[in-house]
From Swiss-Prot:
Residues 2-75 are annotated as: Interaction with CHMP5. Residues 185-198 have a biased composition (Low complexity). Belongs to the VTA1 family. PANTHER family: VACUOLAR PROTEIN SORTING-ASSOCIATED PROTEIN VTA1 HOMOLOG. The keyword Manganese does not apply. This is Vacuolar protein sorting-associated protein VTA1 homolog. InterPro entries: Vta1-like, Vta1/CALS_N, Vta1/CALS_N_sf, Vta1_C. Gene3D superfamilies: Immunoglobulin FC, subunit C, Vacuolar protein sorting-associated protein vta1. Pfam families: Vta1, Vta1_C. One of its GO terms (cellular component) is multivesicular body. It comes from Bos taurus (Bovine). Involved in the endosomal multivesicular bodies (MVB) pathway. MVBs contain intraluminal vesicles (ILVs) that are generated by invagination and scission from the limiting membrane of the endosome and mostly are delivered to lysosomes enabling degradation of membrane proteins, such as stimulated growth factor receptors, lysosomal enzymes and lipids. Thought to be a cofactor of VPS4A/B, which catalyzes disassembles membrane-associated ESCRT-III assemblies. Involved in the sorting and down-regulation of EGFR. It is a peripheral membrane protein. It is found in: Cytoplasm; Endosome membrane.
């Protein structure tokens, strides 16, 4: 993919979107669709914040140029041309990243990759709002992921052992901005460099974990090459993708026929179509389990009128 034009310095007014733009940079090669929607979210949010100040207008104009260039490069990609496919792609990607971090957390494996995955998942759920309001489930995932990233980051920084798995969210005692501002407050101008996965709060990357590479397999598309650091003599945490467990299919679904008294609404058909799109997107990631679950949901909805 051709390099995009460089953005001007980020205006202070746009501090709230700097991490979404950084996430876009990180995904330019890994997943251009994700990168595109991160920039689209930043553009829409930036327009709401300040579209009149000269420096903001200049920044948004350059960002629009990037969006147009990306859209041209992606061509006929259905995740760009069809909103429902794009929504499914982005939601599945965010969920994969969330589940990777959640599995590491529940196993008591606390490291920068996991912290970064939790936080990036929360940012990507922000981005899903370009398609409309979030579901209650996504709102809960975003809140939990952002809190977990901050909580574990603070524990490791203070030399404490985080509590694994779900714990009560005490948002009043956690400063999310402390995690966001752990590094530089401006967008990185140099190419992203991989870093060791050894956690050292006194030696954090200047771009707030920008250099952390997330191994594919846990959440990334199967054809995404791993961008791992060359051997540096530092022991790193190698994450092995867990074997997929295909959910058991309820045999009753195959024998169920739509009864005459079942009346499906347009909303039912739209939800069924969405589940099928989610299944198709999951298969792009070779995620059979998620694909089967979504197809089962669609089949149940169409045959029973219930979810």
């Amino acid at each position: 993919m051709a390099a995009l034009a460089t953005l001007p310095p980020l205006p202070p007014q746009f501090k709230s979107i700097q991490h979404h733009l950084r996430t876009a940079q990180e995904h330019d090669k890994r997943d251009p669709v994700v990168a595109y929607y991160c920039r689209l979210y930043a553009m829409q949010t930036g327009m709401k914040i300040d579209s009149k100040t000269p420096e903001c207008r200049k920044f948004l104009s350059r960002l629009m140029d990037q969006l147009e260039a990306l859209k041209k490069q992606l061509g006929d990609n259905e995740a760009i041309t069809q909103e429902i496919v794009g929504s499914a792609h982005l939601e599945n990607y965010a969920l994969k990243m969330f589940l990777y971090a959640d599995n590491e957390d529940r196993a008591g494996r606390f490291h920068k990759n996991m912290i970064k995955s939790f936080y990036t998942a929360s940012l990507l759920i922000d981005v899903i709002t370009v398609f409309g309001e979030l579901t209650d489930e996504n709102v809960k995932h975003r809140k939990y992921a952002r809190w977990k990233a901050t909580y574990i980051h603070n524990c490791l920084k203070n030399g404490e052992t985080p509590q694994a798995g779900p714990v009560g969210i005490e948002e009043d005692n956690v400063d999310v901005e402390e995690y966001e501002d752990a590094g530089a407050t401006s967008l990185p101008t140099q190419p992203l460099q991989p870093s060791s996965s050894t956690y050292d709060p006194s030696n954090m990357p200047s771009s707030s974990y920008t250099g952390i590479q997330i191994p594919p397999g846990a959440h990334a598309p199967a054809n995404t090459p791993a961008e791992v650091p060359h051997s540096t003599g530092v022991t790193s945490n190698t994450i092995q993708p867990t074997p997929q467990t295909i959910p058991a299919i309820d045999p009753a679904l195959f024998s169920t026929v739509s009864q005459g008294d079942i009346r499906l609404t347009p909303e039912d058909f739209a939800r069924a179509q969405k589940y099928c799109k989610y299944a198709g997107s999951a298969l792009q990631y070779e995620d059979v389990s998620t694909a089967v679950q979504n197809l089962q949901k669609a089949l149940k909805l169409l045959t029973t009128g219930r979810e």
